[in-house]
Amino acid sequence: MRRRKAPVREVLPDPIYGNKIITKFINSLMYDGKKSVATEIMYGAIKAIEKKNAEVKGIDVFNDAIENVKPILEVKSRRVGGATYQVPVEVRPARQQALAIRWLITFARKRSERTMVDKLANELLDAANSKGASFKKKEDTYKMAEANKAFAHYRW
């Protein structure tokens, strides 16, 4: 284990929208260090969203999608006297954002559209409209926390 907590490294805002969340999203989307490919996919998805419905901005849809997918509660396993309990805990803001990004990318990759740009654009649109697999994942996480509310007193 490390002696000290690692300092949080600051991410630079992306060059087009000046948004740090987009930079984090691109970094999570990246495979094998190919950031230019991930950047093309991300900006392509935002353009595709704007093309589908001209009256909304792609960046607003992206922000709505992130907000709708952020989990408030999650369950953590806690072992007490030989039994393992699923204890509901609140999610820290940084983890909320990280989970939202991870779920959006994971479920976008699992979609059946042809290109990753289309997959990501449609997943972001669904999430912004409170639909889609990533939103369902958030709902399932919340239901698990609600179901195990009785074990909330085992918090750390």
UniProtKB/Swiss-Prot annotation:
GO biological process: translation
A Pfam family the protein falls into: Ribosomal_S7
Keyword Cell inner membrane assigned: no
Keyword Ribonucleoprotein: yes
Keywords for this protein: Ribonucleoprotein, Ribosomal protein, RNA-binding, rRNA-binding, tRNA-binding
Cellular component, GO annotation: small ribosomal subunit
Molecular function as annotated in GO: rRNA binding; structural constituent of ribosome; tRNA binding
Superkingdom as given in the UniProt entry: Bacteria
Coiled-coil regions listed in the entry: none
HAMAP family registered for this protein in UniProt: Ribosomal_uS7_B
NCBIfam families referenced in this protein's UniProt entry, alphabetically: rpsG_bact
Subunit annotation: Part of the 30S ribosomal subunit. Contacts proteins S9 and S11.
The family this protein is said to belong to: Belongs to the universal ribosomal protein uS7 family.
Function of the molecule: One of the primary rRNA binding proteins, it binds directly to 16S rRNA where it nucleates assembly of the head domain of the 30S subunit. Is located at the subunit interface close to the decoding center, probably blocks exit of the E-site tRNA.
Protein name: Small ribosomal subunit protein uS7
Organism name: Campylobacter concisus (strain 13826)
Organism classification: Bacteria, Pseudomonadati, Campylobacterota, Epsilonproteobacteria, Campylobacterales
